[in-house]
């Protein structure tokens, strides 16, 4: 049964401007070391950062907390399975909220264009 869903769009140019303005301070505040390593070895890095930003926002919406209750950006991590399929890992406060919801499965779909990153998260128990 679906216990939460979230969707989000992130503008690539907005993420790019933030990275160019704040550099590593912005990147390390938002993204996990695994996400940074993945994106930095790929082409179209700003698009990939935007899609991961959208996934984090969609995850916050899906668990129903938004920014409240101590949820942090790095509580949500986009990782890729060996097949390349993206998955959303939860850590810290977000993981505890998901446990309270009885989440057993997290479905993540992400995509990006030159202009937008998009993500959709579905939580199931």
Swiss-Prot record:
One of its GO terms (molecular function) is holo-[acyl-carrier-protein] synthase activity. Mg(2+) binds at residues 8, 57. Keywords: Cytoplasm, Fatty acid biosynthesis, Fatty acid metabolism, Lipid biosynthesis, Lipid metabolism, Magnesium, Metal-binding, Transferase. It comes from the Bacteria. It catalyses: apo-[ACP] + CoA = holo-[ACP] + adenosine 3',5'-bisphosphate + H(+). GO terms for biological process: fatty acid biosynthetic process. GO terms for cellular component: cytoplasm. Its cofactor is Mg(2+). It is an enzyme of class 2 (transferase). It is found in: Cytoplasm. InterPro entries: 4-PPantetheinyl_Trfase_dom (IPR008278), 4-PPantetheinyl_Trfase_dom_sf (IPR037143), ACPS (IPR002582), Ppantetheine-prot_Trfase_dom (IPR004568). Belongs to the P-Pant transferase superfamily. AcpS family. Transfers the 4'-phosphopantetheine moiety from coenzyme A to a Ser of acyl-carrier-protein. This is Holo-[acyl-carrier-protein] synthase. It comes from Solibacter usitatus (strain Ellin6076). The lineage of its organism: Bacteria, Pseudomonadati, Acidobacteriota, Terriglobia, Bryobacterales. The gene is acpS.
């Amino acid at each position: 049964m679906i216990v939460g869903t979230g969707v989000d769009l992130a503008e690539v140019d907005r993420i790019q401007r933030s990275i160019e303005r704040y550099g590593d301070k912005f990147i390390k505040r938002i993204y996990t070391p695994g996400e940074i390593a993945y994106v930095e070895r790929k082409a179209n890095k700003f698009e990939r950062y935007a899609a991961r930003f959208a996934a984090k926002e969609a995850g916050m919406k899906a668990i129903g907390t938004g920014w409240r209750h101590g949820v942090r950006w790095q509580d949500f991590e986009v990782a890729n399975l060996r097949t390349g399929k993206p998955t959303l890992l939860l850590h810290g406060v977000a993981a505890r909220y998901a446990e309270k919801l009885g989440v057993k499965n997290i479905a993540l779909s992400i995509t990006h264009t030159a202009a937008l990153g998009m993500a959709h998260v579905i939580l199931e128990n």
